[in-house]
């Protein structure tokens, strides 16, 4: 199965070289960096490092993910941040359950292992717990982490009819996938503070607060969502 990695990036020229160099070629077929209105050399650096660059000028995490999704034809889509806080060598941990037919959506959790939890700031952990609990009430899926490192079948993402264009994208994906009765799996992933640049969410209290508020609104909005029946061709 063709695996495509989509990396939304806003002013990540410092982190991208190390991140892109660490992506295992044997596990990935293509890498797309979505330049989300950067004011630095993000696009130039990404292209120089061999990634395909897509531009999305509407600043928003979901908007960047959507632009990357539309630009690729991969059968498995992996989303990860461009700040080197996650480890590309673990991409196969996310894609393997999908390839083996064990899952449709695999979430990378930074809080399943005690050794990784402390790398996540307290305010981010508290926000994760609150949002994850409300998602559990709404969808009967109880995620331990709302992190962005995840893999999903393309055919599933197409059916989710994603609408959120900001930080609500990860929450919307989980809620809708659960209502489609998708097989959702969490796997532990390693995490570290960003290596360069400025944190927009987890490493920034105001960013975490803003993201959590956005996710809470998303839970309220999509908790009653009903999936459309799959289209069928007429005889």
Name each model-derived stretch.
Residues 57-59, 63-71, 89-167, 194-216, ...:
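Acceptor/aglycone-binding surface of glycosyltransferases and processive sugar-polymer synthases
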Residues 7-18, 37:
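Active-site beta-to-alpha loop of glycosyltransferases that engages the nucleotide-sugar donor
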Residues 35-43:
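A conserved acidic beta->alpha catalytic loop
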Residues 77:
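Short aromatic/hydrophobic "clamp" motif used to bind/position activated sugar donors
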Residues 36, 80-82:
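Active-site acidic Asp-centered loop
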Residues 2-4, 30, 172:
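Cell-envelope/extracellular polymer assembly enzymes that use nucleotide-activated donors
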Residues 141, 165, 174-192:
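Catalytic donor-sugar/metal-binding loop of nucleotide-sugar-dependent glycosyltransferases
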Residues 21-29:
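Short, acidic, metal-binding catalytic loop of nucleotide-sugar glycosyltransferases
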């Amino acid at each position: 199965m063709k695996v495509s990695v989509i990396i939304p990036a806003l002013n990540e020229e410092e982190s991208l070289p190390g991140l892109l160099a660490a992506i295992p070629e044997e596990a990935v077929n293509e890498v797309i960096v979505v330049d989300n209105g950067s004011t630095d050399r993000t696009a130039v650096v990404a292209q120089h490092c061999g990634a395909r660059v897509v531009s999305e000028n509407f600043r928003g995490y979901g908007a960047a993910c959507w632009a990357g999704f539309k630009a690729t034809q991969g059968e498995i889509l992996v989303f990860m941040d461009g700040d080197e806080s996650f480890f590309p060598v673990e991409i196969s941990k996310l894609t393997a359950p999908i390839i083996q037919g064990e899952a449709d959506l695999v979430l990378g959790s930074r809080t399943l292992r005690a050794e990784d939890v402390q790398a996540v700031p307290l305010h981010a952990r508290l926000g994760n717990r609150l949002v994850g609990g409300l998602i559990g009430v709404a969808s009967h899926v109880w995620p331990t982490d709302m992190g962005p490192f995840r893999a999903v079948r393309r055919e599933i993402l197409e059916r989710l009819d994603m609408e959120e264009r900001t930080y609500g994208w990860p929450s919307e994906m989980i809620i809708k996938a659960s209502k489609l009765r998708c097989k959702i799996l969490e796997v532990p992933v390693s995490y570290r503070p960003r290596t360069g640049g400025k944190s927009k969410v987890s490493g920034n209290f105001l960013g975490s607060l803003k993201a959590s508020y956005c996710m809470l609104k998303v839970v309220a909005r999509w908790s009653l969502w009903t999936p459309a029946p799959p289209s069928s061709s007429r005889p």
